[in-house]
């Protein structure tokens, strides 16, 4: 083996300053044969309306309630909410090994469109703008009552999505979840140490280097982070300091719709399939502090590795030691960057 380090050939670790953890990169493993589980792919064209779908307009939900005949994004209280608005406070324990705390909150569902067949990349930028407006409205409403509001989407059965109608979720809670609390601490520490905002500095460096950028628009950039864990993981960030979705200008909001369409289209084009992922926004909490250390960003965590049927599993060493990836972040970005911004289903034959 060569004594000269080559990042595309040699195992190495990369540091994620946002969560204060390391990831093991093993590029030499990318060529290993695969005889393990393969995902089932259903490429049947979905109808624009499904009479059996609990989320389509005018249909009856599992609870018996009727959906309105909605024509734009529609929000309703989750029928199987993970959080409740009024829960009693657990009795305080003196035993340090058995601690609990109160968890209050609300869980809501947002149907992106009345069309059962249209995921985000198949919506127009104008239709995605409508989704963003609803996200912002929900943040304003729920942020007045709870310190954390999590906007997210689980897309595809591979990510545990229980209903094929394109939708996301909005959970608001009275506490800072673990991942958010960790990002809050690391960004605060960075500001105290360096006098600048971590992810603003990071965007500037990535825009200079270019090698991990996937999509760039006037106000936004989507990139494969240097410390990515999932094969085609991306981080979506504004180019300037913005703490929350509710603080975006009209131009930034419109441009967010553009880059969301472009990024998710590239994802679908990679293996010409409806690309599964979990995505969500992280932003400054609604805790009454100035939160100048925070920078708005969205994480996209897609599981697919080699094809539409082969996914990455977080098991073994990754559960017991630390996260590990084969493909380098630069290689993943290069593949995504080279893809068309026209969806494979919309190309002229």
Each model region followed by its residue ranges:
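Acidic/histidine-rich, metal-coordinating catalytic segments
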Residues: 279-283
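A contiguous, surface-exposed recognition patch within enzymatic or periplasmic domains that forms
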Residues: 243-252, 256-261
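Extended C-terminal subregions enriched in glycine
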Residues: 255-274, 278
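Active-site microenvironments that recognize anionic phosphate/pyrophosphate groups
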Residues: 1-165, 171-243, 251, 265, ...
């Amino acid at each position: 083996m060569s004594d000269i380090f080559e990042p595309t050939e040699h195992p190495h670790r990369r540091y994620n300053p946002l969560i204060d953890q390391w990831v093991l990169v093993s590029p030499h493993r990318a060529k290993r044969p695969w005889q393990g589980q393969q995902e089932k792919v259903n490429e049947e064209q979905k109808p624009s309306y499904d009479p059996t779908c609990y989320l389509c307009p005018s249909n009856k939900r599992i609870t018996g309630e009727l959906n309105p005949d909605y024509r734009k994004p529609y929000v309703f209280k989750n029928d199987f909410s993970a959080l409740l608005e009024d829960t009693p406070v657990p009795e305080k324990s003196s035993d340090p090994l058995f601690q609990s705390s109160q968890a209050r909150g609300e869980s809501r569902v947002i149907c992106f469109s009345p069309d059962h067949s249209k995921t985000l990349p198949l919506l127009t930028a104008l239709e995605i703008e409508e989704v963003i407006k609803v996200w912002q409205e929900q943040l304003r409403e729920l942020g007045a009552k709870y310190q954390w509001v999590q906007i997210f989407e689980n897309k595809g059965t591979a990510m545990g999505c229980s209903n094929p109608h394109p939708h996301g979720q909005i959970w608001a809670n009275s506490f800072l979840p673990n991942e958010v609390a960790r990002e809050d601490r690391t960004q605060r520490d960075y500001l105290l140490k360096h006098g600048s905002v971590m992810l603003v500095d990071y965007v500037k460096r990535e825009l200079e280097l270019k090698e991990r950028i996937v999509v760039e628009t006037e106000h936004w950039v989507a990139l494969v982070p240097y410390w990515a864990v999932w094969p085609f993981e991306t981080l979506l960030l504004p180019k300037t300091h913005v703490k929350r979705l509710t603080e975006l200008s009209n131009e930034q909001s419109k441009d967010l719709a553009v880059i969301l369409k472009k990024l998710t289209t590239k994802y679908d084009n990679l293996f010409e399939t409806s690309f599964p992922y979990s995505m969500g926004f992280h932003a400054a909490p609604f805790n009454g502090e100035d939160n100048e250390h925070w920078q708005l960003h969205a994480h996209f965590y897609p599981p697919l590795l080699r094809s539409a049927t082969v996914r990455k599993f977080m098991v073994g060493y990754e559960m017991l030691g630390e996260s590990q990836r084969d493909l380098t972040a630069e290689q993943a970005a290069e593949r995504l960057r080279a893809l068309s911004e026209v969806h494979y289903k919309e190309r002229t034959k």
